[in-house]
């Protein structure tokens, strides 16, 4: 599914809004994600840290787990916005790409050559990749059949 610029910008704004809920007292780096389901619903997520570090969760996985728990298991795109906790979202920070674990979790539910990963610095400044570009030669459910 090809997304129009307005749809991409809407996802970016929703991800920036989700970032405001991030709980990041240790890294002080807040991330928000907006995941577009095949049902056309948008599922949001933010990163949630923990003093023990490993129990924390990334924004992208929070959005995926929320969507799956609500019955959606097919996705079209995700927008990701990140930056230092004390900075406003959508200021010119660097692009925030999903970690390897998040890429693999997304891979479970999407066609990697068609799923759009939108990395945004601002509403106007963003990059769009397919998951396949970010996770080449990936392992997925079809490998277990």
Task: Give residue ranges: language-model regions.
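Small-residue (primarily alanine) positions within well-ordered alpha-helices
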Residues: 15, 33-34, 63, 67
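Compact, glycine-rich, soluble single-domain proteins
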Residues: 47-61
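Short, solvent-exposed cationic patches
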Residues: 58-80
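Short Gly/Pro-enriched turn/cap motifs at secondary-structure boundaries
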Residues: 24-25
